[in-house]
Amino acid sequence: MATEHNVQLVPGSQKIPKGVVSPRSAAEGPALTRRRSKKESWHPGSQKASSGDQSSSQGSEASGSSKHPPRTKVGQEEPSSAPARPASHRHSHRHRSDPQQDAAQRTYGPLLNRMFGKDRELGPEELEELQAAFEEFDTDQDGYIGYRELGDCMRTLGYMPTEMELLEVSQHVKMRMGGFVDFEEFVELISPKLREETAHMLGVRELRIAFREFDKDRDGRITVAELRQAAPALLGEPLEGTELDEMLREMDLNGDGTIDFDEFVMMLSTG
């Protein structure tokens, strides 16, 4: 009879035949396989592919940026695509002299300067205005005002002197006039400023006065004969016949051979 042998399996003593995978090795196998597959995803070939994808995505971003240009920061000027204009265009709107206006200024300019310009004498109304302003600041009524009151007195007359102008006037009064001025000295100080202020403020009344200096017969028109007659006294020199004819032709807007007051005013206007 065959003898039965009781075989006891001792843990760890059993040998595993070749070709048979133990449960532990089987568990490790997939883990090794997973690590291997992860390493394969880091293969240089895959890096090249990913870099190619990045380059393609960067290219798409670059193409998209060309469609949508970057915004300009606040305070930064946008580049102008329009071509720069030549420098000559900057001065294309300069004021061009008008022959008619030049002729009028040449004819009537000396008269107006003598009557209403910087070299004219003050009229009675202007002297009365200065007298009233002087008396307002002569508080003790002794006929003098101090240099400290000159600035306020000038402002009362409508002038706005600068600090430098006030300093010059004050120094002049203190050093040469003892710090006080009487009315005559006050007029000497103020009249140049007054003439300068009104030299370019000719009203209708002043223009009519100048017009009557030429219009001797008071018919409201200036003829060639009247222009020739008034020229030596008003302009300081006689005018030749051809020069008179040319001047009258340039200033005679309606072509009637004479200059009326409207034409006189229009030719003297500096528009």
Curated annotation (Swiss-Prot):
Ca(2+) 1 binds at D138, D140, D142, Y144, E149. Residues 87-96 have a biased composition (Basic residues). PANTHER family: CALCIUM-BINDING PROTEIN 1-RELATED, CALCIUM-BINDING PROTEIN 4. Ca(2+) 2 binds at D215, D217, D219, R221, E226. The modification Phosphoserine is found at S37. GO terms for molecular function: calcium ion binding; transmembrane transporter binding. Keywords: Calcium, Cell projection, Cytoplasm, Metal-binding, Phosphoprotein, Repeat, Synapse. Pfam families: EF-hand_1, EF-hand_7. Residues 125-160, 179-196, 202-237, 239-271 form the EF-hand domain. GO terms for cellular component: cell projection; cytosol; presynapse. This is Calcium-binding protein 4. It is found in: Cytoplasm; Presynapse. Ca(2+) 3 binds at D252, N254, D256, T258, E263. Expressed in retina and in the inner hair cells (IHC) of the cochlea. Involved in normal synaptic function through regulation of Ca(2+) influx and neurotransmitter release in photoreceptor synaptic terminals and in auditory transmission. Modulator of CACNA1D and CACNA1F, suppressing the calcium-dependent inactivation and shifting the activation range to more hyperpolarized voltages. It comes from Mus musculus. PROSITE patterns: EF_HAND_1, EF_HAND_2. Its main location: cytoplasm. Residues 1-105 are annotated as: Disordered.
